[in-house]
Amino acid sequence: MNDAFSTAQHRLDALGLRCPEPVMMVRKTVRQMAAGETLLIIADDPATTRDIPSFCEFMDHTLIASETTQTPYQYLIKKGL
């Protein structure tokens, strides 16, 4: 596991879920976080490779790291203001 992923303050397991469920769960989890906190998302839906980066851009969160070369995919996001 990438060192960046091991520093996450929150973790969300979205394995087995299909669009739009992973992004809906990310949104719900991020709402409960403070600005600046980080979330590790583990997913296996190929749609997340497009949806998670788009979600971050649209909602002003930062996609710190992603690993999408093999499943499970991993995403580390930092909550914006």
UniProtKB/Swiss-Prot annotation:
**Its principal location?**
cytoplasm
**Keyword terms of this UniProt record:** Cytoplasm
Q: Where is the active site?
A: 19 (cysteine persulfide intermediate)
A Pfam family assignment: TusA
Which Gene3D superfamilies does the record cross-reference, listed alphabetically?
TusA-like domain
Q: Which domain of life is it from?
A: Bacteria
Give compartment(s). Answer: Cytoplasm
Q: Which GO terms describe its biological process?
A: tRNA wobble position uridine thiolation
One Gene Ontology CC term in the entry: cytoplasm
**One Gene Ontology MF term:** sulfur carrier activity
* Family to which this protein belongs: Belongs to the sulfur carrier protein TusA family.
What does it do? Sulfur carrier protein which probably makes part of a sulfur-relay system.
Looking up HAMAP family in the UniProt record yields: Thiourid_synth_A
Name recorded for this polypeptide: Sulfur carrier protein TusA
Higher taxonomy = Bacteria, Pseudomonadati, Pseudomonadota, Gammaproteobacteria, Alteromonadales
Annotated gene: tusA
